[in-house]
Amino acid sequence: MEGDCLSCMKYLMFLFNFFIFLGGACLLGVGIWVIVDPTGFREIVAANPLLFTGAYIMLAMGAMLFLLGFLGCCGAIRENKCLLLFFFMFILLIFLAELSAAILAFIFRENLTREFFTKELKKHYVRNNDTHVFSSTWNSVMITFACCGVNGPEDFEAVPPLSHLPLEETTPEACCQRKLQSREGMFVNRKACLEGDERFQNRQGCYTVILNSFETYVYLAGALAIGVLAIELFAMIFAMCLFRGIQ
């Protein structure tokens, strides 16, 4: 009976570690996607080290979980006490680090608010300057999502280098409607747009558009993080039980 329980525990631990392996692969994939993202969203928040570093933390955690899941599977199948103990200590450290990161993310969640992005836009944006990384990235986002600023064209009234100009002269070209949403796309009516004709401007703010586009993925990432933490907790319990059961 004891042998059957040990065998069952061994395969359960293998299963949990296989899920850790998959979770690590997912985090690794998301981290790589954020870093190499062709639309350059990372440049928008590059001024905030906490947000910019988050992708690299996710990448590192994904790589460690990927390796850890593989080692856990090997330790369970081979019934190696040394490998199981190493696995338990390592996954405990990762579990505590991830829990700390989740708490910090909750505490600093205001850094992703509408007000934060509006402040950063007004502080760093230079109109129609594609040699300026921050501005070029914002232009790409506005063209791709057919939106303007964080809240709308009025955001550009307070852009420092242009604050002395009327609203219609402060609206960037990137806010003008195009027949095709790309930099190569022809303007519907560029002149009327820059003169302030709202019919040819993208009036909706990018914050709402992007939030609606990525809302599903945000919830998915949160669910994935909770799932990974739960699996790690169960894996630690099974690892210690298996460690004590091996003669």
Swiss-Prot record:
PROSITE patterns: ALBUMIN_1, TM4_1. Residues 37-49, 104-222 are extracellular. The chain crosses the membrane at residues 16-36, 50-70, 83-103, 223-243. GO terms for cellular component: membrane. Glycans are attached at residues 111, 129. GO terms for biological process: negative regulation of neural crest formation; regulation of sprouting angiogenesis. It is found in: Membrane. CDD domains: uroplakin_I_like_LEL. It is a multi-pass membrane protein. Its main location: membrane. Induction: Downrwgulated by FOXD3 during neural crest migration. Residues 1-15, 71-82, 244-247 are cytoplasmic. Maintains CDH6 protein and promotes CDH6-dependent adherens junctions, inhibiting neural crest migration. Belongs to the tetraspanin (TM4SF) family. This is Tetraspanin-18. It comes from Gallus gallus (Chicken). The lineage of its organism: Eukaryota, Metazoa, Chordata, Craniata, Vertebrata.
